[in-house]
């Protein structure tokens, strides 16, 4: 039933998913992995990647704007002394530094969205660096979600984690 619904209402589901992704990031301060897995499961590898990247970038930009207006003093108080030496470098080429910052994995999503308020990054630079910088991580997670859909369709029972990890459909 779910697959029929998914195939018949792809545009509507895409709009709801995009809105849900934006809401997931901004007010709830969620991270992107569950959304990326769900996007791959529902939409497949390519459409899921585009929707998740767009939704997470918009949500992250809203979170950055919120932090810039309401949390800037608190963030500067907590973190400025640790990142004082980067402030001048960031101002010279903020897009490239932010892009490298977004390519790095392992930084909690909330911190990676709020920390650039220290350097007064322009909103357009933040949005486009986020849009480009999260592509590799999100593509991998969406591919895993897409592979999960294929594994679930093929098996009548719930697969083990080792079955999921070593299935070639996840990586292709």
Question: Model-found features: residue ranges?
Answer:
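Membrane-interfacial helix-loop-helix
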Residues: 1-19, 53, 57-114, 118-125, ...
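Transmembrane helix boundary and interhelical junction motifs in multipass membrane proteins
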Residues: 21-42, 46-47, 106-113, 134-140
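A sequence-composition feature that detects small, non-aromatic residues
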Residues: 36, 60, 129, 141-143, ...
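Interfacial segments of multi-pass membrane proteins
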Residues: 36-58, 117-128, 132
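C-terminal membrane module of polytopic membrane proteins
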Residues: 133-172
């Amino acid at each position: 039933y779910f697959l029929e619904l998914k195939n018949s209402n792809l545009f509507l589901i895409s709009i709801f998913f995009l809105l849900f992704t934006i809401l997931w990031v901004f007010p709830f301060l969620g991270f992107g992995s569950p959304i990326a897995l769900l996007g791959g499961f529902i939409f497949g590898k390519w459409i899921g990647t585009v929707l998740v990247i767009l939704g997470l970038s918009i949500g992250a930009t809203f979170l950055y704007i919120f932090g810039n207006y309401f949390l800037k003093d608190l963030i500067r108080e907590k973190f400025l002394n640790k990142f004082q030496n980067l402030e001048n470098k960031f101002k010279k080429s903020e897009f490239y530094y932010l892009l490298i910052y977004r390519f790095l994995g392992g930084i909690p999503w909330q911190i990676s969205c709020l920390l650039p308020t220290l350097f007064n990054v322009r909103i357009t630079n933040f949005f486009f660096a986020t849009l480009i910088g999260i592509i590799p991580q999100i593509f991998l997670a969406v591919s895993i979600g897409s592979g999960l859909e294929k594994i679930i369709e093929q098996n009548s029972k719930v697969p083990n984690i080792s079955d999921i990890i070593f299935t070639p459909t996840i990586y292709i």
